[in-house]
Curated annotation (Swiss-Prot):
Family recorded in the similarity comment: Belongs to the polyribonucleotide nucleotidyltransferase family.
Residue ranges constituting the KH domain according to the UniProt record: 555-614
UniProt keywords, alphabetically: Cytoplasm, Magnesium, Metal-binding, Nucleotidyltransferase, RNA-binding, Transferase
Domain S1 motif span(s) in chain numbering: 624-692
HAMAP family for the chain: PNPase
A biological process term (GO) from this entry: mRNA catabolic process
Chief localisation class: cytoplasm
Name of protein: Polyribonucleotide nucleotidyltransferase
Record's catalysed reaction(s): RNA(n+1) + phosphate = RNA(n) + a ribonucleoside 5'-diphosphate
Residues the record lists as binding Mg(2+): D488, D494
Entry GO MF terms: 3'-5'-RNA exonuclease activity; magnesium ion binding; polyribonucleotide nucleotidyltransferase activity; RNA binding
Length: 703
């Protein structure tokens, strides 16, 4: 009799077999599911505190996706030989799981919840993110914690005009899209994607396809819950204090309506904070006992009602715009004198200073991924200091939000970058958000594109991004173009679209409510396209095309190709030749296995000298060609002649003169410069030379 009460569910999901198990591992967690998807195995666990902390006014959910190197049969490369801080992929996957599950916890549930996912085994063809999403959904669903799930998720590729469910890593290389969608049976909640300039129709089709396929996983989770689910918590949302709400409305509503007539963000924020202070003072004056956190929540609800009702009634938005207008745009290129490329992109009260730096291949980021090491020649880093919103706060290493925003901007630009053959530089773009009032990640896309073009990167097209919002009440809805920060907090959907005039390159969507239909998404995408075209027009006015030359302060890269068999000649014994070349010419030289050599230098003369010397070292001896060289050694049967650096040929005694030569030293001496003709080379690369082939044959005199 086993001590385990193990329950297993298996299902076929496209090309993959998926097995979910519970009851054997991590039995003390609130919920634990071991999921195997064709050899990629993840363990998702969920634990929730039984009570919320007193005074808690937000939902403390944490999601940690952790990859173990043993999953790929590897030992960590760090000094301590154990896993350290999360990689960028782990951070992004943690966010990917957090985003669709967070809206499904009931309003007023403030108990701490922690979801931890360990990747225990990895099939390089099956990335861990989709298995982790499904396992997390299953673990939450069987735990009994208040959760309006389960959710399903799927990855969608677009290959040869067809949607492909959960493609392998190799298949993805041939896809023009990499899209992840997650949602409940009824509604899409989250989309994260990159694409190679695809139309709105194709992207929407992928979302619908992925959502339908995700329901296969949801059905399997329902079966697991039926057989292994724990009792649902006896939890009820705290009863609302209707008397206190009425008093707060009476004290604050008119003042908040007036505050939301103020167009300037800073002044409006100051006014709403004053309303909060006055409301609390008014309640005290009336002798009402209250919890300050609860009152602030009530005021937020009033603000949301004011803003939402005004927009649905067709009134102007917070800053006076209608639903389709983009805020005023200002663009300035080459802002910084000594950087390789820079742009200042301002849209209303959101501003990004974006700077591009060009480097050599040695500057590429080496990524030690679980599925294999690789190099990344394009980096985009996003920073948002607290002063951007007029606040104080911690400054230091990037937070999850900053990593996520940087990745989104990178996804948007990567489709239009030149190939390595067209532009061999490593590129690093840094977006410094200097002001923020909504959509700073999309400002980073616009500024990033302009900054790259300013640096002389031959982009295939301009890329612009726009953040959209949605407010929905029953059958009424309004799609908002270029949302403000307040509209983001008070709205029902936040989605960001980036692309060119030809199509979408990145799409991110987060939906907070059920009932967003395909038709609503269609309207939103069409309105986003209209805004994107407007911004692209402004960008093209500011900078029609990339600068023809890179900055004077950027390294110049010169590429040449040699026979791969000659690489060892260029490197030399113990690296002596390449070291001497770089030191004597003042250049950086990078050699690839296929014989591609990249020379980096700010001085074209130095680069030309390095090229000339490499050409000499790698030159092939040509049969029939005449060379001038010094004799390096005298032999009994001839002499060795240096034809070019590192290449000698044999001048046989019979090829010195037309007459018979008894002693080589009668004709030649070491160090003597002579002209010789190449007769042949054998299969081992040995070269046979002749002097007499260049001499006139003596006349034959008859006596």
């Amino acid at each position: 009799m086993s001590i385990f009460n193990k329950v297993t569910k298996s299902f076929q999901w496209g090309q993959h077999k998926v097995t979910m198990e519970t009851g054997e591992m991590a039995r003390q967690a609130g919920g634990a599911v071991l999921l195997d998807m064709d050899g990629t195995v993840v363990l998702a666990t969920v634990v929730a505190k039984s009570d919320a902390k007193p005074g808690q006014d937000f939902f403390p959910l944490t999601v940690d996706y952790l990859e173990k190197t043993y999953a790929a049969g590897r030992i960590p490369g760090s000094f301590f030989k154990r896993e350290g801080r999360p990689s960028e992929f782990e951070t992004l996957t943690s966010r990917l799981i957090d985003r669709p599950i967070r809206p499904l916890f009931p309003e007023g549930f403030f108990n701490e919840v922690q979801v931890v996912i360990h990747v225990l085994s990895l099939n390089p063809e099956v990335e861990g993110d989709i298995p982790a999403l499904i396992a997390s959904s299953a673990a939450l669903s069987i735990s009994g914690i208040p959760f309006n799930g389960p959710i399903g998720a799927a990855r969608v590729a677009y290959i040869n005009g067809e949607y492909v469910l959960n493609p392998g890593k190799t298949q993805l290389q041939n896809s023009t899209m990499d899209l992840v969608v997650a949602g409940t049976e009824a509604a899409v909640l989250m989309v994260e994607s990159e694409a190679k300039q695809l139309s709105e129709e194709i992207m929407l089709g992928a979302i619908v396809f992925g959502h339908e396929q995700g329901n296969i996983a949801i059905n399997a989770i329902h079966e697991l819950v039926r057989d292994a689910g724990k009792p649902v918590w006896d939890w009820k949302a705290p009863a609302k204090d209707e008397v206190l709400i009425a008093k707060v409305v009476a004290l604050a509503e008119e003042k908040l309506v007036a505050a939301y007539q103020i167009r300037n963000k800073q002044a409006r924020t100051h006014a709403t904070r004053q309303v909060t202070t006055w409301t609390k003072m008014g309640l005290k004056a009336e002798g009402v006992e209250f919890d300050g956190v609860a009152v602030e929540g009530m005021l937020f609800d009033i603000e949301a009602k004011i803003v939402r009702s005004q927009i649905l009634a067709g009134d102007p938005r917070i800053d006076g715009r209608d639903t389709r207008t983009v805020r005023p745009i200002e663009i300035r290129n080459s802002v910084l004198p000594r950087t390789h490329g820079s742009a200042l992109f301002t849209r209303g009260e959101t501003q990004a200073l974006v700077v591009t730096t060009l480097g050599t291949e040695r500057d590429a980021q080496r990524i030690d991924a679980l599925s294999g090491d690789y190099e990344d020649r394009f980096m985009l880093h996003y920073n948002m200091p607290p002063f951007a919103t007029g606040e104080t706060g911690r400054v230091g290493s990037p937070k999850r939000r900053e990593i996520g925003h940087g990745r989104l901007a990178k996804r948007a630009l990567i489709a239009v970058l030149p190939s390595k053959e067209e532009f061999p530089y490593t590129m690093r773009v840094v977006s410094e958000i200097t002001e923020s009032n909504g959509s700073s990640s999309m400002a980073s896309v616009c500024g990033g594109c302009l900054s790259l073009m300013d640096a002389g990167v031959p982009m295939k097209a301009h890329v612009a991004g726009i953040a959209m919002g949605l407010i929905k009440e029953d059958n009424r809805f309004a799609v908002l173009t270029d949302i403000l920060g307040d509209e983001d907090h008070l709205g029902d959907m936040d989605f960001k679209v980036a692309g060119t005039t030809f199509g979408i390159t990145a799409l991110q969507m987060d939906i907070k409510i059920q009932g967003i239909t395909k038709e609503i998404m269609q309207v939103a995408l069409a309105q986003a396209k209209e805004a994107r075209m407007h911004i692209l027009g402004k960008m093209q006015e500011a900078m029609g095309q990339a600068n023809a030359e890179v900055s004077d302060f950027a390294p110049r890269l010169y590429v040449m190709k040699i026979n791969p068999e000659k690489i060892r000649d260029v490197i030399g014994k113990g690296g002596a030749v390449i070291r001497a070349l770089t030191e004597e010419t003042g250049t950086q030289i990078n050699i690839e296995e296929d014989g591609t050599i990249t020379i980096a230098s700010n001085d074209s003369a130095k680069a030309d000298e390095a090229k000339r010397r490499i050409a000499e070292i790698t030159a092939e001896v040509e049969i029939g060609k005449v060379y001038e060289g010094a004799i390096t050694k005298i032999l009994d049967f001839g002499a060795l002649v240096n034809l070019m650096p590192g290449k000698d040929g044999l001048l046989h005694i019979s090829q010195i003169a037309h007459e018979r030569v008894e002693k080589v030293t009668d004709y030649l001496s070491e160090g003597q410069i002579i002209k010789v003709k190449v007769l042949e080379t054998d299969e081992k690369g040995r070269v046979k030379l002749s002097m007499k082939a260049l001499l006139d044959r003596p006349s034959q005199h008859q006596g």
